[in-house]
Swiss-Prot record:
Protein's recorded name: DNA nucleotidylexotransferase
Homology family: Belongs to the DNA polymerase type-X family.
Function: Template-independent DNA polymerase which catalyzes the random addition of deoxynucleoside 5'-triphosphate to the 3'-end of a DNA initiator. One of the in vivo functions of this enzyme is the addition of nucleotides at the junction (N region) of rearranged Ig heavy chain and T-cell receptor gene segments during the maturation of B- and T-cells.
The encoding gene: DNTT
Motif interval(s): Nuclear localization signal: 11-17
Pfam families: BRCT (PF00533), DNA_pol_B_thumb (PF14791), DNA_pol_lambd_f (PF10391), HHH_8 (PF14716), NTP_transf_2 (PF01909)
Ranges for domain BRCT: 27-124
Tagged with keyword Magnesium: yes
Binding site for a 2'-deoxyribonucleoside 5'-triphosphate: G333, F334, R335, R336, G337, K338, H342, D343, V344, D345, G448, W449
Region (Disordered): 1-24
GO biological process: DNA metabolic process; DNA modification; double-strand break repair via nonhomologous end joining; response to ATP
Amino acid sequence: MDPPRASHLSPRKKRPRQTGALMASSPQDIKFQDLVVFILEKKMGTTRRAFLMELARRKGFRVENELSDSVTHIVAENNSGSDVLEWLQAQKVQVSSQPELLDVSWLIECIRAGKPVEMTGKHQLVVRRDYSDSTNPGPPKTPPIAVQKISQYACQRRTTLNNCNQIFTDAFDILAENCEFRENEDSCVTFMRAASVLKSLPFTIISMKDTEGIPCLGSKVKGIIEEIIEDGESSEVKAVLNDERYQSFKLFTSVFGVGLKTSEKWFRMGFRTLSKVRSDKSLKFTRMQKAGFLYYEDLVSCVTRAEAEAVSVLVKEAVWAFLPDAFVTMTGGFRRGKKMGHDVDFLITSPGSTEDEEQLLQKVMNLWEKKGLLLYYDLVESTFEKLRLPSRKVDALDHFQKCFLIFKLPRQRVDSDQSSWQEGKTWKAIRVDLVLCPYERRAFALLGWTGSRQFERDLRRYATHERKMILDNHALYDKTKRIFLKAESEEEIFAHLGLDYIEPWERNA
């Protein structure tokens, strides 16, 4: 730690000249009038501050030289929210309203984008609870969230996309993925549950004291959290990221149609790059894998919400051409509010169960083939049986008819500013899954296909262990009463389980 008042003890440094970098933004240059930024020099330094101020002003941001009551956003580097508040209290300037306290990474992202970007948990600076308590004496407050009851089940927690603990959850997601690649299910579940509960917290963990009372954080998990708090990274995660096997499996499984068994085979054969795999004449690829290689660049790029909405319009047009009363619902991450995804899932159902419905997906495929919109498809026939009990496995696949396909999305269907096209291309390959379910099972199918994966796992686990019921994408069965419980909506399923309803955008466990 630097000695107090070190600036008075060290030799005086020549102050940089106040060039245009420190001049206030001129009104004609300001594009974003409602946003007033002040960059804190503490721990950043004069030169870097001046550099960032100039960059931000060039992009049309209003950046103040001095703190004033007009400031709406305070940006700092290597400071906590508590550090910034302490600095603010030492200033004589009265700030009329509480400004946003943000890490410099937010401003850098704004500069790159040329416009204000969304403020998320990773940008917001954290104020220590003990600091806020000591600086605001008064009546007792609600106990910190960490010591309140947090459920071990994701279905009893509200998890939005505002992740305040991304530095930890990213680490556990990597460790869980590595365990999945090694088929170490127990450790995979341990890390997935840890990441899930941390995503639900409305505050950032900044000390080990903050982890007290939080479920799903065993000694190994806490050890990793402590290391990240102290060193800024986990040595175990670093080792995984540098591990040749992990890197190879990550690469191989990015190909549509390639799973763990194939990845293991290729790795044991000595392959480490996709170019070597593709050029090897001894390997035989499935139709799905051939399509995965053929459209690889498009398929590994993210699908934007605008692209997903464009696909949705085309799916509905095709379905309604054959079944006008059908309900077509976008599920998966996009239903949970995500702006990006790797594929687009749709649930299709119709009040009238007819032969037309059974042939629907094949008719849609034929239509798209004629229009040149279909690059690949694999139609899986239904094996659904009405009287079959729900599966006891938390990761069980359903038995509905479904189609896994690669759709050719025309460029003119999407706003160019909202898509991720390769330059010069007039279309993009998009992964799409269509699921056709009986109308009376639509609530169960919708709940299952909305996700997230961990939310669904915990929902099924909760049903089994806490309610003596079995739940899957087809049905809910009460083992005590020995009856199937009917549901017209997701809300009714939650009610059967005795759970508060969790909105789709709160299921990002």
